[in-house]
Amino acid sequence: MSASSILDLVREDLRAFAGYSSARTSALQGDVWLNANESAWANPADPDASTRRYPDPQPKGLRSALAALYGCAPEQLLIGRGSDEAIDLLVRGLCVPERDAVLVTPPVFGMYAVCARLQNAPLVDVPLVDGPDGFHADIPAIVAMALSSNAKLVFLCSPSNPAGSAIALDQIEQALQALQGKALVVVDEAYGEFSDVPSAVGLLGRYDNLAVLRTLSKAHALAAARIGTLIANAELIALLRRCQAPYPVPTPCAAMAEQALSAPALEVTRRRIAEVRSERERMHKALVQLPGVRQVYPSQGNFLLVRFDDAEGAFQALLEAGVVVRDQRAVPRLADALRITLGTNEQNQRVLSALQRTQEAAA
């Protein structure tokens, strides 16, 4: 797909959309700023006056740091309020209500479906296949359904939440090739740092119908800062930026995120990722040995999806031990499952101890 034709996937009424021109988007220079109706005084709660001015819509330092981290050009990258905002922008920007479908692969992160329904875009499901080695995406079925349903967006969560499985790059490439000119393939790599599968960002040079979602919420421990990243064709990024709210990145959050991407902070993050991966292996081995545990799915994320003979009993036992996990029982095909985030060694041991006590009491 050429750089110009990627915009053919965008809603016709938005292709020439100029968006809102904020005071910060103008290139004017000066030392007395009276163009945005901001206060001339700092709030007493803000002694450094760091939040008196509206923020840079796309902070240049942070954008450059994120581009270096993810291996793309800054102009291929949009910063938003978590990946949630990027998902919403994609659905609103590409899907005509009641016409252009959004394809998802349940069980999967729920925001894709939420954004589709808010846009009144048809939602198409191609469920993950639950095989002997865990859940996996059926790429031929996904492609066939995307083509037959007029899907404009195909969301591939890799590693998948809550299933934990990742999609090999050659499979993603199959989807990209088959859907060129038809749909944008969005690879959500929120848990990519924990995975053995390389990032799909490396495919951007060959496929303009690819978008990749990344976040600082998981491996980088900045969930409350709400720093999400959309990586895609530069023209598509520029257009979606015009559809975005004027000031999506608060200055304190941008400053914290940029500091988190410094060399010393990244080294700490790398060590913590290694610890999570080690704990993931340990917990998997320990959980499969527990009576009452029916199945522990392989995971490329920072969590494990576990099926229980008595999921309610396991859930309540963990709560009584002060441990809160994600109840998946309302999700189709996961009526006996809990998702357990991998914490510290001590936290994970509390999980094992609580589940062990439950089985001993039931014996």
UniProtKB/Swiss-Prot annotation:
The modification N6-(pyridoxal phosphate)lysine is found at K218. GO terms for molecular function: histidinol-phosphate transaminase activity; pyridoxal phosphate binding. InterPro entries: Aminotransferase_I/II_large, HisP_aminotrans, PyrdxlP-dep_Trfase, PyrdxlP-dep_Trfase_major, PyrdxlP-dep_Trfase_small. Pathway: Amino-acid biosynthesis; L-histidine biosynthesis; L-histidine from 5-phospho-alpha-D-ribose 1-diphosphate: step 7/9. Keywords: Amino-acid biosynthesis, Aminotransferase, Histidine biosynthesis, Pyridoxal phosphate, Transferase. It is an enzyme of class 2 (transferase). Transmembrane segments: none annotated. Signal peptide: none annotated. Its cofactor is pyridoxal 5'-phosphate. One of its GO terms (biological process) is L-histidine biosynthetic process. Its EC number is 2.6.1.9. Pfam families: Aminotran_1_2. It catalyses: L-histidinol phosphate + 2-oxoglutarate = 3-(imidazol-4-yl)-2-oxopropyl phosphate + L-glutamate. Belongs to the class-II pyridoxal-phosphate-dependent aminotransferase family. Histidinol-phosphate aminotransferase subfamily. Homodimer. NCBIfam families: hisC. This is Histidinol-phosphate aminotransferase. It comes from Xanthomonas axonopodis pv. citri (strain 306). The lineage of its organism: Bacteria, Pseudomonadati, Pseudomonadota, Gammaproteobacteria, Lysobacterales.
